[in-house]
Regions:
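Extracytoplasmic
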Residues: 1-173
């Protein structure tokens, strides 16, 4: 059976059971397993572990405000197997700025697995995504992902907003 919840924190839960008939002198075999699959899109409101990155929630849709100087946010227990890059869905608030984005494993100073830039040209309400390639993570473990954002342009008052973060899988050959 498959179930999914509506709204944020969407998880697909797959539950399966198996029982055979057994045979003369043998007990039936049975087993059960559950797998929970998270959505590959995290909305801004779901990203609660952050430093110097504020939540702007006046529209009931939730956005994260890029930091004035630097800041980070953290996603817990993410399986990055098969992920080639992430996309930050951004919305300009009308003032130009340049931002450096780093992706680190398990801690603020952890292994650097991706680095990119977001250049906000200052066009008000323009949606522009920042795509950052990720070095392959092949250990099949769950990791905490730290996303560091550094503003190259200081004193920007109308900083861009993050609507969501999307994990993009590698293309299969």
């Amino acid at each position: 059976a498959a179930t999914a919840t509506d709204g944020e924190n969407t998880v697909l839960s797959l539950f399966a059971t198996y029982t055979d008939q057994g045979a003369t002198g043998l007990k039936p075999l049975s087993s059960a397993a559950t797998v929970n699959l998270r959505s590959n899109i995290f909305n801004a409101r779901e990203l609660t572990e952050r430093t110097r990155i504020a939540l702007k929630d006046s529209t009931n849709s939730g956005f994260l405000v890029y930091p004035e100087n630097n800041g980070w946010l953290k996603l817990n227990k993410i399986d990055l197997s098969g992920i080639s890059h992430i996309e930050l869905m951004n919305l300009s608030k009308g003032e130009a700025g340049n931002y450096t984005i780093e992706l680190r494993l398990d801690s603020e100073k952890g292994l650097l697995i991706g680095k990119g830039n977001f250049i906000d040209n200052g066009t008000f309400n323009l949606q522009k995504n920042a795509s950052i390639s990720i070095k392959p993570v092949i250990d099949r473990k769950l990791h905490d992902l730290h996303i560091h954002i550094v503003s190259d342009s200081k004193n920007v008052k109308q900083r861009p907003l993050i609507r969501s973060i999307k994990f993009i899988p590698a293309k299969l050959l």
